Amino acid sequence: MTSSVSFASFRFPWLLKTFVLMVGLATVAFMVRKVSLTTDFSTFKPKFPEPARVDPVLKLLPEEHLRKLFTYSDIWLFPKNQCDCNSGKLRMKYKFQDAYNQKDLPAVNARRQAEFEHFQRREGLPRPPPLLAPPNLPFGYPVHGVEVMPLHTILIPGLQYEGPDAPVYEVILKASLGTLNTLADVPDDEVQGRGQRQLTISTRHRKVLNFILQHVTYTSTEYYLHKVDTVSMEYESSVAKFPVTIKQQTVPKLYDPGPERKIRNLVTIATKTFLRPHKLKILLQSIRKYYPDITVIVADDSKEPLEINDDYVEYYTMPFGKGWFAGRNLAISQVTTKYVLWVDDDFLFSDKTKIEVLVDVLEKTELDVVGGSVQGNTYQFRLLYEQTKNGSCLHQRWGSFQALDGFPGCTLTSGVVNFFLAHTEQLRRVGFDPILQRVAHGEFFIDGLGRLLVGSCPGVIINHQVRTPPKDPKLAALEKTYDKYRANTNSVIQFKVALQYFKNHLYCST
């Protein structure tokens, strides 16, 4: 009995310890599992199905928006297939082809197109498309400004290789209108095609390659006045292209102003007169008051020639009624000074007619023509030009483009009043169309658009003679006849519109 109690007493603590140990292990296991589950759930991110990829929609701004962005003086100056003179705020002034009889128009258009194509060939039009550089080219090369005279040779600047190292470098250069060479003294196996249209460079040395490239020459082999060659430079799959302009430089034509640079050695005054001898005499008297020895050239297509007793007046007669622009051409052709001042025969010089001011403007700027004002009237107008296939649109707007730097009050424009100083040579290059016999002015500036840079300085003023009829019956009769010739009739307007349709390849104007 005693022994059984002792055994039971001994076994109970052991069982208790075992139970406690098992409970402890279970608790630890539960805690570890709980932490693990917590970690798993905290890092778990549900996977949602990805939406299908949709390509972005590429679109341009609507035309209404573009018109707001690129409009100048109500004119949408943006590339388009056909310019329009009757859209938006524009109102058509002339549709030039309407000046022709409809049955004559097909034949006129055929001749017009043939002449236009001839003009384009002579001007090198249309221009070649722009050269586009592919990305990541291993070359250095010129992008603009390489120019050579016909049959001359130049070094091509800026050629170099900037790509990765290679066991062998092979670069090929090609030209179309000239030949290529190099000044580098290297073996023939490193440079092949000297003096040919294709030059091949092959070398193991990067330094040698760049030395050869730095001394590559271009030789023009055919005579052109103005042509553009495209030279290509190839390495493996990379190709660079750049322009070489072949252009014959002009010989300067200079006028000696003399050691003292007197105004009479710089400027000649020119005018055209017709049936107004009394007006011309008043003009000459006013000129002599301020410029006693300046040369004045007069072209006259009146019936009766005048007697002018002035050592500094050159007087040229023409067939009766030969015309306004023909007389301008005659007068300009006889000028021997750097500048010519154009005035009408009924103008009047005053102390504000400072030719020296206009000379100073032309001497210090790139202007070809600078106008003054006639009693405050500058007649400034801007010409905006749009080219399209079937004819161009011409928009005339009053005013100027911008101020002329360095000359307060002066501006840049397209056309000015009949009182202007011009470079004699530039005036001759544009010329005055002699077919315009009676009423013409703006037509000269249209012909000169793109050739003449025109300015206006209103501070230089010439006066207009009074328009009261003369008391002398003979002079009054002359003025009456003059007015008939100067009338801007509907037939005269129609003639000029037809002329501009064909000659200037115009479609419409506003």
Swiss-Prot record:
Pathway this chain belongs to: Protein modification; protein glycosylation; Glycolipid biosynthesis
EC number in record: 2.4.1.-
CDD domains with a match to the protein in the record: Glyco_tranf_GTA_type
Domain of life, source organism: Eukaryota
InterPro entries xref list: Glyco_trans_2-like, GM2_synthase, Nucleotide-diphossugar_trans
Keywords recorded for this protein, A-Z: Disulfide bond, Glycoprotein, Glycosyltransferase, Golgi apparatus, Membrane, Signal-anchor, Transferase, Transmembrane, Transmembrane helix
Class of enzymatic activity (EC top level): transferase
GO biological process: lipid glycosylation; negative regulation of cell-cell adhesion; protein glycosylation; protein import; skeletal muscle fiber differentiation; skeletal muscle tissue regeneration; UDP-N-acetylgalactosamine metabolic process; UDP-N-acetylglucosamine metabolic process
Cell compartment(s), UniProt: Golgi apparatus, trans-Golgi network membrane
Cellular component GO terms, alphabetical: Golgi membrane
Residue ranges crossing the lipid bilayer per the database entry: 16-32
Membrane topology, from the record: Single-pass type II membrane protein
Glycosylated residues, chain numbering: 390
Predominant cellular place of this UniProt entry's protein: Golgi
Catalytic reaction equation(s): an N-acetyl-alpha-neuraminyl-(2->3)-beta-D-galactosyl derivative + UDP-N-acetyl-alpha-D-galactosamine = an N-acetyl-beta-D-galactosaminyl-(1->4)-[N-acetyl-alpha-neuraminyl-(2->3)]-beta-D-galactosyl derivative + UDP + H(+); a 3-O-{alpha-Neu5Ac-(2->3)-beta-D-Gal-(1->3)-[alpha-Neu5Ac-(2->6)]-alpha-D-GalNAc}-L-seryl-[protein] + UDP-N-acetyl-alpha-D-galactosamine = a 3-O-{[alpha-Neu5Ac-(2->3)]-beta-D-GalNAc-(1->4)-beta-D-Gal-(1->3)-[alpha-Neu5Ac-(2->6)]-alpha-D-GalNAc}-L-seryl-[protein] + UDP + H(+); a 3-O-{alpha-Neu5Ac-(2->3)-beta-D-Gal-(1->3)-[alpha-Neu5Ac-(2->6)]-alpha-D-GalNAc}-L-threonyl-[protein] + UDP-N-acetyl-alpha-D-galactosamine = a 3-O-{[alpha-Neu5Ac-(2->3)]-beta-D-GalNAc-(1->4)-beta-D-Gal-(1->3)-[alpha-Neu5Ac-(2->6)]-alpha-D-GalNAc}-L-threonyl-[protein] + UDP + H(+); a neolactoside IV(3)-alpha-NeuAc-nLc4Cer + UDP-N-acetyl-alpha-D-galactosamine = a neolactoside IV(4)-GalNAc,IV(3)-alpha-NeuAc-nLc4Cer + UDP + H(+)
Molecular functions per Gene Ontology: acetylgalactosaminyltransferase activity
Keyword Membrane: yes
Sequence ranges on the Lumenal membrane side: 33-510
Family: Belongs to the glycosyltransferase 2 family.
General function of this protein: Beta-1,4 N-acetylgalactosaminyltransferase involved in the biosynthesis of T-lymphocyte CT glycan antigen carried by CD45 family of protein phosphatases. Catalyzes the transfer of N-acetylgalactosamine (GalNAc) group in a beta-1,4-linkage from UDP-GalNAc to the galactose residue of NeuAcalpha2->3Gal-R to form GalNAcbeta1->4(NeuAcalpha2->3)Gal-R glycan epitope.
Complexes and interactors: Homodimer; disulfide-linked.
PANTHER family: BETA-1,4 N-ACETYLGALACTOSAMINYLTRANSFERASE 2, GLYCO_TRANS_2-LIKE DOMAIN-CONTAINING PROTEIN
Protein's recorded name: Beta-1,4 N-acetylgalactosaminyltransferase 2
The organism's taxonomic lineage, starting at the top: Eukaryota, Metazoa, Chordata, Craniata, Vertebrata
Gene: B4galnt2
